[in-house]
């Protein structure tokens, strides 16, 4: 399954979560799209549909294809320490595009992915163009010298509140780092990862 490229606001309303991170989609229309969306409540879902919806919420939040998402889920299951769902969250958050987003170098995850793809981002001084690159705590994430005047980057940094507890960022140098692995309570409070584990366990 390919990465979703359709209307994000409509999808946000269908899933009941802000995929942009701004919350504007749900503030304006806090109901599902369609003729029967504005009824004041969402229809009751089956157990399978609830699990699928939770999986889709997380997958679309990080903008991954089903194959990328499932492979990362399987990788998380091979980590011996910790819970499967929590480890899955950590792997999602330590992707290079996620760290670039958390540092405030991009205003959205798709924008962060584009910065990485186009070679604007360095890891420990070396250009990395793979959004799924796994960042380790202490690695320095910076902007390539010739890219430091790119307007979207500067605008994102200026607008960023930079309140992510597991990263540090120097706005003057346009560089930062993942200081430690995130704790579960610092991530996705509106996501129930146990439902995602149940979904994939059901598939076998």
Curated annotation (Swiss-Prot):
GO terms for molecular function: rRNA binding; structural constituent of ribosome. InterPro entries: Ribosomal_uS4, Ribosomal_uS4_bac-type, Ribosomal_uS4_CS, Ribosomal_uS4_N, S4_RNA-bd, S4_RNA-bd_sf. Residues 22-43 are annotated as: Disordered. Pfam families: Ribosomal_S4, S4. Coiled coil: none annotated. Gene3D superfamilies: Ribosomal Protein S4 Delta 41, Chain A, domain 1, RNA-binding S4 domain. HAMAP family: Ribosomal_uS4_B. NCBIfam families: PRK05327.1, rpsD_bact. This is Small ribosomal subunit protein uS4. It comes from Oenococcus oeni (strain ATCC BAA-331 / PSU-1). The gene is rpsD.
